[in-house]
């Protein structure tokens, strides 16, 4: 317990908050190249393989990013745009690829939640 005099001389030091998405450098998105695209099994109660891309960002950080939605065309040397947002059942995956931007195509024929998957508006008949 500090004395009043010690507090006057030095004050209290605020705790520093850790940045969960340090690789983004305070940016909303970053662009990168995929050196590897693979699948990874999730944590315990879940079992479906998660599509994961290793991405080398434009600031030379190497990260793992989740590719959302069913099916994708991403392969080696694809350019992708990355946003924050972790995958709860995949340890170490703290980013998402944005569908419908750069080389990663959106999902065709998707009708609901289209903006999250880069899907075109369907033609009304």
Curated annotation (Swiss-Prot):
Annotated compartments: Mitochondrion
One GO term describing the cellular component: small ribosomal subunit
Region (Disordered): 1-51
UniProt superkingdom: Eukaryota
Main location class: mitochondrion
Basic and acidic residues compositional bias, start-end: 10-23
Keywords: Mitochondrion, Ribonucleoprotein, Ribosomal protein
Any one GO molecular function term: structural constituent of ribosome
InterPro entries registered for this protein in UniProt: NA-bd_OB-fold, Ribosomal_uS12, Ribosomal_uS12_bac
Listed GO biological process terms: translation
Homology family: Belongs to the universal ribosomal protein uS12 family.
Record's function text: Protein S12 is involved in the translation initiation step.
PANTHER family: 30S RIBOSOMAL PROTEIN S12 FAMILY MEMBER
Protein name, as recorded: Small ribosomal subunit protein uS12m
